[in-house]
Amino acid sequence: MEFEYSYNSTTTESINENLIYEDFQNLKTQEIISYISLYFNNLINQNYKNKNKKKERQNDDFYSRKIPLLTIEKYLNRIIKYTQIEKSTLIISFIYILHIIEKGKYIICKNNIYRLILSSCLIAFKFNEEKNYFKNSYFGKIGGINLNEINFLEYSILSKINYQLYINENEFYFLVEQIIKNEK
């Protein structure tokens, strides 16, 4: 997988949004999940090779000593199974994490990725979906954490993305295009 998140407003000039929209409609949720999990697994392996483990814990609200036994892909499938979040919400949650990484000096590792995924899905779900009827405690149960923790993680993600929840259409379709290219 060759993908670096390098979106900027000039990047999208080559994107044919109508074609991408049609492709997005045909894109399966499992393809998105596979892409996201592959991306994070590659990033974690790269960070593990390049960084000192002690740096991973510095100022990391998402760090957990206990790593879930599920793979990232199975963890995402679990979230989908119990929330039925839409494909667009899943992509938006991924973009939120990419924005955090993009700001620099944030090291993704096995000890923080699961909490990042869970809390970004919660925020994207609240922002993007009309059927927002799940309580934070429900999301916490899905991820195996208590209400206080999920509330703290929600606040932490919002702070790290400066409460910028809106993802412009060009950025969204830029990422969709990357997923589609990877599937071919």
Name each region found by the language model.
Residues M1-S88, I92, Y96-I108, N151, ...:
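Acidic, Ser/Thr/Pro-rich regulatory low-complexity segments at or just upstream of the first helical elements
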